[in-house]
């Protein structure tokens, strides 16, 4: 466990399976097959969300019949999860997952004192699984310095991978998430939840993220792209550090069909760009946070079609009467 080498990889797509929609381990296995069919590389399973969870019975069925690598999470209530039982039993479920060849085990930073025992358990069972140390931050995204401190604390545990999740109250907070990838010495999963945090998933490959999370068809999750859109509209496997970012600035923005129209056009002309929806609350703050050259141009929707003129270097006379307009940073 642990490495000082920065991993180079193509981003992996992780299906977030909301396990409370399934009433049996067999149905969870079916959900994993659905995730694979929709393009997922890995599946995250929340044991704390499984109704009437029986660790030995359910984990055996799930892990012995998995069609994809599995990340096991057993999130306690004190970290935003649903588990309220005995802490030792919670950790025992993770140890059992190790014995049954889980590919990734998630351990909260606050519970990192259990890592030596878990690592020894992995060695005793010849496990090749990886340990993810995670931290979920309540409230708005903290300042950059606080986030860096959390990253350093998680790295110091010796984890193979670290994971940091915040709640985005404003899209400009996501820039702090993107900046963390420059400082991390192990693979990092970092994103913000909620509709304003969507770009933290879609642009993760550009900045060096290890996972991108997606939702299954028929089970949308706020702030997560669907697995289908990752494959068909955004084609995140082609996004890299040189990718130019375009997007729709609007509030709300989930209705936009722009990604379906523009991203295929980029690919048709072999242009390294991505078009994403951007839920923006404050135009001035947004433009000062995401300047050129990486953020190259924007379409503007309601309620900013008139206000955006104040931020343009030049305005073509025809733009005054257009229903929507393209803003280009010069």
What are these regions (language model features)?
Residues 243-330:
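Phosphate/diphosphate ligand-binding glycine-rich loop within oxidoreductases
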Residues 3-145, 159:
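Active-site beta->alpha loop and helix N-cap motifs at the rims of alpha/beta catalytic domains
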Residues 1-13, 232-242:
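Eukaryotic N-terminal low-complexity, Ser/Thr- and Lys/Arg-rich leader segments
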Residues 24-27, 143, 147, 173, ...:
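Structural motif
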Residues 17-23, 136-138, 165-168, 276-283:
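Short beta->alpha junction loops
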Residues 71-74, 133-135, 190, 318-329:
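Short beta-strand elements of ligand-binding domains
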Residues 104, 110-244:
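Catalytic alpha/beta core domains of metabolic enzymes, predominantly
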